[in-house]
């Protein structure tokens, strides 16, 4: 048996990220005594370096390494760059929140970097084992981050629920993986697709495997009926952690969905398509209806996020390259919009007020007109109101669903989008037309956070004015 040394070049960003994060974990014990910001700045520098490595080695063709278990392609590189940008925004927003709430720790940043590493591995995984490895790296980091606030009973409860349900979902995924492996005799996505296409497989075992895999994927995405953890974890976790969970991991979960179903199981499209139709419909309805009664903004964004996941799944249902690129575009747009939404809450939060209730935004236009305008941009984009980019994200997905012959599904999506616009516009109404409960001004937001919120919010408008470039980029990557 000949041992061939694999090419490490396609995985250089991941290797550098793992090495620097491990070194940072050790260095943090020294830095924490000298400079409380050293770990933060080192984290941002590491992300810049990794982003630069991805950008300079951008792959326009598919490159496999590590015996075909790791793939480097344009699809993966684009998602990795978005993960890097979103993660830098997360850490920028989180720094002051952690300081004000007296649990600024280097572990938040190192765990966050390990989470990014897991996302990178998931995005580039090309077999079932590598995908599981990336998923566990990301998940373990997230469990620990949710439980970081040891003195907060709600955070500990959220962490326990997240861990138990996460373990259950992982078990479902592994059971599905074992069935697919048992039926095909391979864990490589391309080989699985070829074997299934040949027809020499047990379709019953494959069908059961697909069911368990889709259930596991639905949990990771937070789709109905496997969404039980989403509102409680979003609400119970510290807002800085909610900001992390609600943004970048969604990109990795979408990549996981695409790699397994589209690249690994295209021959079973009729099986997984019908399941995803059901999950998407439930997510759209639950996400729109239950959000109507939410008064806590974090829970509101959690339930509305479930509705957005329903839209992402619509693109997958189309089962063609245009549909997949529309879903990819929606995922990127949603992650940026969620970053802006949760970032606004983090920026306004204070030690004695988390600023996470809709009522907290009453009369915000009188207390801080600029931030009220930025919040309006965020809410309009989430609602899908032109000319913001959220509108075009919904349009391209609905268009592809109609082209694929699911007109009834497109009509349902439009109706749910109209219903969901109500609770986003309610926040705008509260800011501009309700009187503040007290006449005190909102405590000044630091210039750094002010610029960050403004940049991300205005980006939602600018991307909406020229969406074709990002849509084309997504299409060409597949």
Swiss-Prot record:
Keyword Mitochondrion among UniProt keywords: no
Subcellular location: Cell inner membrane
Spans traversing the lipid bilayer: 7-27, 46-66, 74-94, 109-129, 163-183, 204-224, 237-257, 273-293, 300-320, 328-348, 371-391, 405-425, 451-471
Membrane topology classification: Multi-pass membrane protein
GO biological process: ATP synthesis coupled electron transport
Catalytically driven reaction(s): a quinone + NADH + 5 H(+)(in) = a quinol + NAD(+) + 4 H(+)(out)
Disulfide bridge partners, by residue number: none
Protein keywords: Cell inner membrane, Cell membrane, Membrane, NAD, Quinone, Translocase, Transmembrane, Transmembrane helix, Transport, Ubiquinone
InterPro entries xrefs: NADH-Q_OxRdtase_suN/2, ND/Mrp_TM
GO terms assigned for molecular function: NADH dehydrogenase (ubiquinone) activity; NADH:ubiquinone reductase (non-electrogenic) activity; quinone binding
Presence of keyword Translocase: yes
Domain of life of the source: Bacteria
Gene Ontology CC terms, in alphabetical order: plasma membrane
The protein's role, per its UniProt record: NDH-1 shuttles electrons from NADH, via FMN and iron-sulfur (Fe-S) centers, to quinones in the respiratory chain. The immediate electron acceptor for the enzyme in this species is believed to be ubiquinone. Couples the redox reaction to proton translocation (for every two electrons transferred, four hydrogen ions are translocated across the cytoplasmic membrane), and thus conserves the redox energy in a proton gradient.
Family: Belongs to the complex I subunit 2 family.
Protein name, UniProt field: NADH-quinone oxidoreductase subunit N
Species per Swiss-Prot/TrEMBL record: Hydrogenovibrio crunogenus (strain DSM 25203 / XCL-2)
Gene: nuoN
